[in-house]
Amino acid sequence: IDSAIVATIAADALGPENVRCVMLPSEYTSQSSLEDAKAVAENLGARYDYVPIKEGRDAVTNTLAPLFEGREPDITEENLQSRLRGLLLMALSNKFGEMLLTTGNKSEVAVGYATIYGDMSGGYNPIKDLYKTRVYESGRWGNENHRPWMMEPAGEVSPVRVIEKPPSAELKPGQKDSDSLPDYPVLDGILDILIDQDGSIEDCIYAGYTREDANSVEH
């Protein structure tokens, strides 16, 4: 949904003919994600490129194998995928003179659920001030509303499945954001108190959130 909203914002501002959508799948990318990414690009009328990361990932994995020998796979291997995607996208940006837009929402950036030199690579982030719940709201609003200044086609751009399916970075089997973070309505409510209202843990508890959730978000 983050990528879909960023693509939509770019198409609205610049025209879909000036937007390039790039899908960079791995073996952990679900079939539904492949279908949804292509659908968003087609709905917008934007260019769609398909760039698998397997060969690059295999090369990096083999290069590091002697150094990583005896150590269990962990978040390092997950971040390799994100950073490889960032490298490939920056190469496209460099070659074709196009600005790479990043897709990290305010919720992810606030709690560090993003990868430096990975999905944070790029020249501008259109959704940097949107919490994840606002991203979902924007997707629903965009499907139902159109304004004369919008350069994207009217109608449904983000398929309902994109908005409704559990969010996942898809960097390992069965991964969901909720494995590492509180549900986004909870996370965003706590972040709003701690960041936007400059509140405290006690303010979060007073608002109805658990101390455990508030402490986990703060740290």
Regions found by a protein language model. Give the residues of each.
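ATP/NTP-dependent adenylation/nucleotidyl-transfer catalytic domains that generate, transfer
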Residues: 1-219
